[in-house]
């Protein structure tokens, strides 16, 4: 596995320079674009890393999986009364579909859906940001994971569109807490700093029927795990979920920080990171690396 990971990174490295970092978030525009890392974590606790796999980066929308899992953990099926689990077919920050469907987001991985999930968690936890940080520390086994307040503040300054979604949902009765408070929590979740190994380990319960082996916790039931993985497969990569299924064939979740996590049910979790994005907002080199890894090992679930 180690040799294969090293080879794959060398094969996709020429793609660096052909994408673009997420410069619409000022704090992310400064991230050196020439970084590339990958980590594979097995259900037996073994792992392999290559490249910049231990360099922390901003997880961004990958955090939407953590907040969804938290909400399912304390509220169960009730969360689906407030949002759906269908692909949207619209940009992740679109207001059009949200208006048409009367404030009920299509799924928890578009921004409107993630905001509803944050609203649900805001009602549950006295300190949602700290609860999220501690939850991720537990899942990853890394007690030093932190929130980059510079990134969170940077995103909050440019919050207008997300605020518009929240207020629109509030007008339809689907947002219960103070909008600005929930936005602060939302951007703090996105600003979690983790590396490839942290993320691969933190997501391993999704490859293991909801059981996190290193913490000894049953995070989700087997059925809930299947549900989360299915939404990742259909909606986890913005408008490129179909292309990801075609090329990689695994449930996955990406973020504009350049990270992508993929689940090999029953076996492994993989995280790849390269900051430069393609036109759909997903890591250009990361997509290519996961495609090579999946095809050479035969991991596709299809």
Swiss-Prot record:
Substrate binds at residues 61, 111, 155, 162, 186, 238, 256. It comes from the Bacteria. Coiled coil: none annotated. GO terms for biological process: glutamate biosynthetic process; glutamine catabolic process. Its EC number is 3.5.1.2. Pfam families: Glutaminase (PF04960). InterPro entries: Beta-lactam/transpept-like, Glutaminase. It catalyses: L-glutamine + H2O = L-glutamate + NH4(+). PANTHER family: GLUTAMINASE. NCBIfam families: Gln_ase, PRK00971.1-1, PRK00971.1-2. This is Glutaminase. It comes from Pseudomonas putida (strain ATCC 700007 / DSM 6899 / JCM 31910 / BCRC 17059 / LMG 24140 / F1).
């Amino acid at each position: 596995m180690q040799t294969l990971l090293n080879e794959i990174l060398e094969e996709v490295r020429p793609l660096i320079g052909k994408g673009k970092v997420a410069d619409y978030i000022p704090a992310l525009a400064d991230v050196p674009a020439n970084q590339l890392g990958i980590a594979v974590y097995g259900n037996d606790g073994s792992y392999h890393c290559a490249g910049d796999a231990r360099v922390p980066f901003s997880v961004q929308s990958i955090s939407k999986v953590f907040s969804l899992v938290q909400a399912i953990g304390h509220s169960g099926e009730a969360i689906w009364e407030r949002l759906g689990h269908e692909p949207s077919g619209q940009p992740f920050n679109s207001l059009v579909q949200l208006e048409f469907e009367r404030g009920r987001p299509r799924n928890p991985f578009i921004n409107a859906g993630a905001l509803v999930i944050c609203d649900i968690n805001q009602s549950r936890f006295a300190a949602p940001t700290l609860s999220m940080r501690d939850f991720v520390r537990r899942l990853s086994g890394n007690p030093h994971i932190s929130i980059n307040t510079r990134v969170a503040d940077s995103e909050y300054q440019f919050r207008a569109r997300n605020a518009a979604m929240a207020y629109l949902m509030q007008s339809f009765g689907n947002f219960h807490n103070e909008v600005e408070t929930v936005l602060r929590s939302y951007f703090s979740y996105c600003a979690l700093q983790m590396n490839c190994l942290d993320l691969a380990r933190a997501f391993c319960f999704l490859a293991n029927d909801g059981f996190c082996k290193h913490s000894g916790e049953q995070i989700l039931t087997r059925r809930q795990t299947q549900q989360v993985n299915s939404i990742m497969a259909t909606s986890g990569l913005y408008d490129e979920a179909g292309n990801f299924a075609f090329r990689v064939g695994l449930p996955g979740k990406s973020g504009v920080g350049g990270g992508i996590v993929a689940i090999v049910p029953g076996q492994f979790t993989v995280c790849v990171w390269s900051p430069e994005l393609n036109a759909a907002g997903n890591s250009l080199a990361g997509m290519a690396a996961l495609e090579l890894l999946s095809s050479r090992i035969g991991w596709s679930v299809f």
